[in-house]
């Protein structure tokens, strides 16, 4: 009986432990791409992501930031939102002008490509961190740190001259500080409140197996497809029993059109070693009921196995207690 109680406790711990979901954070990341074909032709486009969801876009042909979600304005009033958009319009105009002036002063050759990544992340307890990075021709050259602009270690020498000029502009530096330290965390907090249901949604993955192109004579490429899951973090491994196959090659996690994700994991094995292999999928939406697909077509779920074990253990406990009670009753009758 003690052994049965131990097994029951173990099964419960397995079920509870596998259902733990780490706390998620949702950084706001604003991305900007600016192209300068020459001194007279320029284009700047932008978009913003909150965690894994795209929330805003800004076309070069528009003066208005487009909201892609019903809750994209967060808890900002219409006046606050319009003020923020006005700041962005001034920023885009100033950015274009300044780049042209720097190109002339530093004798940079067209075409020019600049990328900007800026935003913030709000943590529990209202703590936050922020970032503002600038890349030139695809390579990071400078960032905003605290109260001023600083070059990266790999930045060209001319970046130091540009930073000297930028740091002399006190109004711009103070505006950047205000946006990063105050406005951004406030805006993100409002987005998290307004978009809570969509941000915290859980969509279960679907998984299937296939055979990929042969890696060579006598070998198989086993492919495990996992699609339609949200949020993005997922764990996929080829297994032999409970042993992870370290040669599993996961691909990139790619977006689907419906804002869910797709991943495939491959394993190159000898044809005679494919039997007994399985693909295991862990995701927060499964609540501990991992998907296991066996090479050869069978399917099972760890959660169902745990439930079956629990049911059997409970049945054995009931039978054991009932049998013991009957024996005690019969002994009392004899006495």
UniProtKB/Swiss-Prot annotation:
Superkingdom field: Eukaryota
Keywords, comma-separated and alphabetical: Cell membrane, Endoplasmic reticulum, Endosome, Glycoprotein, Immunity, Immunoglobulin domain, Innate immunity, Lysosome, Membrane, Signal, Transmembrane, Transmembrane helix
Chain ranges on the Cytoplasmic side, renumbered to this chain: 323-335
Gene3D superfamilies in the cross-refs: Immunoglobulins, MHC class I-like antigen recognition-like
CDD domains named in the record: IgC1_CD1
Signal peptide: 1-19
Subunit architecture: Heterodimer with B2M (beta-2-microglobulin). Interacts with MHC II.
Name assigned to this protein: Antigen-presenting glycoprotein CD1d
Native source species: Pan troglodytes (Chimpanzee)
Name of the gene encoding the protein in the UniProt record: CD1D
């Amino acid at each position: 009986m003690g052994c049965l109680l131990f097994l029951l406790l173990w099964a419960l711990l397995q079920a509870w432990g596998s259902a733990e979901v780490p706390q998620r954070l949702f950084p706001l990341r604003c991305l900007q791409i600016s192209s300068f074909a020459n001194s007279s032709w320029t284009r700047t486009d932008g978009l913003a992501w909150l965690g894994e969801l795209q929330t805003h876009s800004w076309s070069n042909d528009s003066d208005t930031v487009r909201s892609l979600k019903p809750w994209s304005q967060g808890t900002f009033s219409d006046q606050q939102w319009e003020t923020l958009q006005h700041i962005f319009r001034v920023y885009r105009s100033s950015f274009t002008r300044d780049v042209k002036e720097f190109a002339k002063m530093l004798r940079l050759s067209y075409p020019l490509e600049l990328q900007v990544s800026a935003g913030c992340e709000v943590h529990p307890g209202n703590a936050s961190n922020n970032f503002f990075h600038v890349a030139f021709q695809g390579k990071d050259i400078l960032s905003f740190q605290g109260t001023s602009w600083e070059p990266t270690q790999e930045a060209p020498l001319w970046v130091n001259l540009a930073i000297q000029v930028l740091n002399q502009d006190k109004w711009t530096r103070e505006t950047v500080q205000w946006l990063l330290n105050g406005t951004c965390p406030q805006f993100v907090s409002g987005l998290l409140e307004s978009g809570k249901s969509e941000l915290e949604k859980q969509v279960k993955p679907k998984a299937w197996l296939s055979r990929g192109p042969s890696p060579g004579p006598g070998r198989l490429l086993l492919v495990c497809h996992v699609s339609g899951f949200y949020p993005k973090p997922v764990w996929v491994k080829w297994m032999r029993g409970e042993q992870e196959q370290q040669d599993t090659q996961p691909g990139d996690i790619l977006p689907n059109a419906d804002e869910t994700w797709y991943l495939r994991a491959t394993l190159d094995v000898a044809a005679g070693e494919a039997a007994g292999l399985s693909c295991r999928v862990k995701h927060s939406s499964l609540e501990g009921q991992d998907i296991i697909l066996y090479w050869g077509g069978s399917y099972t779920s760890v959660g169902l196995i745990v439930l079956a074990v629990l049911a059997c253990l409970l049945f054995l406990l009931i039978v054991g207690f009932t049998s013991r009670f009957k024996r005690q009753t019969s002994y009392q009758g004899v006495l």
